[in-house]
Amino acid sequence: MATEDDGELSARYQNTLDALSSLITKRGRLASNNQSHRFRLLFHYLKVLELEDAVSQMKIIHVAGTKGKGSTCTFAESILRCYGLRTGLFTSPHLIDVRERFRLNGIEISQEKFVNYFWCCFHKLKEKTSNEVPMPTYFCFLALLAFKIFTTEQVDVVILEVGLGGRFDATNVIQKPVVCGISSLGYDHMEILGYTLAEIAAEKAGIFKSGVPAFTVAQPDEAMRVLNEKASKLEVNLQVVEPLDSSQRLGLQGEHQYLNAGLAVALCSTFLKEIGIEDKNGLDQTNGLPEKFISGLSNAYLMGRAMIVPDSELPEEIVYYLDGAHSPESMEACAIWFSKQIKQNQERNQKRSEQILLFNCMSVRDPSLLLPRLRSKCIDQGVDFKRAVFVPNVSVYNQVGSSTNVGTRVESMSWQFGLQRIWESLARGEAKSNSKSDSKGKEEEKSFVFSSLPVAVDWLRDNARQSKQVRFQVLVTGSLHLVGDLLRFIKK
């Protein structure tokens, strides 16, 4: 029966996720020779999976960067789909379900296909493991799985987002992409990539391939110098692209998306010329973008970035503004987007509103860099948070399951109390400054730590029910995991 089939598939899928979870290892900054060894193993894995020839023939757009690489890939995939190409998109991380990482023609892969492709790869690799050749780690396996899916499904173009860094990233096993892109660079994953922009840029530039054209956006001088040096050594024609004109409608919100869209346009223009679909004149932007580019840009969609979602129980009283920003620069972009949305809403809506921050970040981040950038940029734009809420993420990091329990899993709250202290310190500093210039000061801010996301959402809903005349506008940021947890919890 259909229900029994669905139940059987659901059970198989959960078993698959459990097996995938077994590949998760703790990540840290490995010695260079260890990273190099793990990277070389990827070529062995491709051979075991009999994917060497198929991968070498794939037409690939490869994108690295600190910020905006996922958005750039999303724009590029949407544009190329408008040209009738069968697309394969591999991105990370996922928010709710691991299948989000694998998209065929813009649609995440089905459970049935995912299960079948997974076990095909898993069993073949498991048969060949030894002390010298262990099973691939979690992300390496996902990249190999992407290659298996996209080659078997015979896509016309693969858009690959680098997972971390570039030089030793699992996606960099490809030898001859059609074109490469580097989105905005900044400080992130420094414990792995290095503590200077020069070191980080060198890792990202590791995706450059001899003679393969590459594009980037305007970068800090230190980073740009390294990118140019790496490109010159490999005879790569590296070009810097400008943001798209802000009159162009984009499917992804935020002013920073015009920069990502500009990079995507350059990548797609080059790709289409290289495979002979469009000639150079057909993509001359001086006469405006081709209609298919305009359509692709305006219809692009990426979950968890600049996303507005009403609460499932109290849609009129609580609205969530979701953005997975987790670097200092992306915090500023998030603040600008959020502030703009608040102002536009105030112009349209007579109901009084209150802005609330719901925040967490991973312990590898530095909240003393993130929270001040977010707060000061919002204040610059005329938006103040009346309350701030700090919670742990729900997701279990050694478990992939899309059915991750969203109950009240209690952990040590020391990290969240630390976030609260940083926030309150910022508030006290502003209060002192305001008291000197304004005798009235401003309404006292409040901050809270809750043991879990469900408890925090219940608290928000209780407050909203008691204050029907006020609309709560909740910015959820600091971690894509937190954004995914909230989406899962409110069942959106």
UniProtKB/Swiss-Prot annotation:
One of its GO terms (cellular component) is cytoplasm. Pfam families: Mur_ligase_M (PF08245). Belongs to the folylpolyglutamate synthase family. It comes from Arabidopsis thaliana (Mouse-ear cress). Disruption phenotype: Vegetative phenotype does not differ visually from wild-type. No obvious defects in root development. Polyglutamylated folates still detectable. Has significantly reduced methionine levels compared to wild-type. Combined loss of FPGS3 and FPGS2 results in seedling lethality. Seedlings fail to proceed beyond the expanded cotyledon stage, exhibit an albino phenotype and are unable to thrive beyond germination. Fpgs3 and fpgs1 double mutant exhibits dwarfed leaves, late flowering (approximately 13 days after wild-type), reduced fecundity and delayed senescence. It is found in: Cytoplasm. The gene is FPGS3. InterPro entries: Folylpolyglutamate_synth, Folylpolyglutamate_synth_CS, Folylpolyglutamate_synth_euk, Mur-like_cat_sf, Mur_ligase_C_dom_sf, Mur_ligase_cen. This is Folylpolyglutamate synthase. Its main location: cytoplasm. Its cofactor is a monovalent cation. Its EC number is 6.3.2.17. SUPFAM superfamilies: MurD-like peptide ligases, catalytic domain, MurD-like peptide ligases, peptide-binding domain. It catalyses: (6S)-5,6,7,8-tetrahydrofolyl-(gamma-L-Glu)(n) + L-glutamate + ATP = (6S)-5,6,7,8-tetrahydrofolyl-(gamma-L-Glu)(n+1) + ADP + phosphate + H(+). The modification N-acetylalanine is found at residue 2.
